[in-house]
Amino acid sequence: MFRLKELQKKQQQQQQQQQQAAAPATNGTDAVTTEPTDVKRQNSNDLKEIRKQKSKDSYFSLKTKQSSESGSKRANPAELRAQKDIDEMEVPTGCAVSFKDTNDILNFNLSITPTDGLYQSATFQFTINIPSTYPYDPPKVHCDTLVYHPNIDLEGHVCLNILRQDWMPVLNIGTVIFGLMTLFLEPNPDDPLNKDAAQLMIDNKKTFEANVRQSLRGGYISNRQFPKLL
């Protein structure tokens, strides 16, 4: 009887020892199991935070870039005034304005086809450059078409009073275009660049007019051939 109780007691002790031994193992297992989960959760949170920060940095980087680009493309006073002139301009009949580069408003082409006078129906091409000091300084005008004219020399320089001493800041691009058209309608021999043509216009207007017609048909004047425009 005593021996049986002793054996039962030993078995209980062994079971308790096994339970105690198993308890740390279980706790260790939990620690091993839960530790990776906690680390994974922490890593996930860190990753989200990093992504959020990167997204924030990218946004401000983009805004800074846009601001920088906007600043670099800011129009200068000459461009603002030229844009205003063009917006308000009424192009005379027979004139057409074109831009090689739509982003460059300070350089453009002008074609003039007079509707009356000696140069009627011929088309003349001009290049116009607006200086950075505009409107305090006048536009620079070059005639790209070789023409027999008292106020335009054979190199394409144009003699127009408002492009020189008579220029004022209140004048505009439209005024210049109108002035160029007027040169073809009413050539001015009193302020010439082609002095031979101007003198002939004064001395013998009929011969001058004949020379103009001949030049527009691609003929020669003083051993110089002109392009055929009619």
Swiss-Prot record:
SMART domains: UBCc. Keywords: ATP-binding, Nucleotide-binding, Transferase, Ubl conjugation pathway. One of its GO terms (cellular component) is cytosol. Pathway: Protein modification; protein neddylation. Residues 10-20 have a biased composition (Low complexity). Residues 77-221 form the UBC core domain. GO terms for molecular function: ATP binding; NEDD8 conjugating enzyme activity; NEDD8 transferase activity; ubiquitin-protein transferase activity. Its EC number is 2.3.2.34. The active site is at C159 (glycyl thioester intermediate). It catalyses: [E1 NEDD8-activating enzyme]-S-[NEDD8 protein]-yl-L-cysteine + [E2 NEDD8-conjugating enzyme]-L-cysteine = [E1 NEDD8-activating enzyme]-L-cysteine + [E2 NEDD8-conjugating enzyme]-S-[NEDD8-protein]-yl-L-cysteine. It comes from the Eukaryota. Residues 1-87 are annotated as: Disordered. CDD domains: UBCc_UBE2F_UBE2M. GO terms for biological process: protein modification process; protein neddylation. Residues 37-57 have a biased composition (Basic and acidic residues). Residues 26-36, 61-70 have a biased composition (Polar residues). Both the N-terminal docking peptide and the catalytic core domain must bind the uba3-nae1 complex simultaneously for optimal transfer of nedd8. PANTHER family: UBIQUITIN-CONJUGATING ENZYME E2. Accepts the ubiquitin-like protein nedd8 from the uba3-nae1 E1 complex and catalyzes its covalent attachment to other proteins. Belongs to the ubiquitin-conjugating enzyme family. UBC12 subfamily. This is NEDD8-conjugating enzyme Ubc12. It comes from Dictyostelium discoideum.
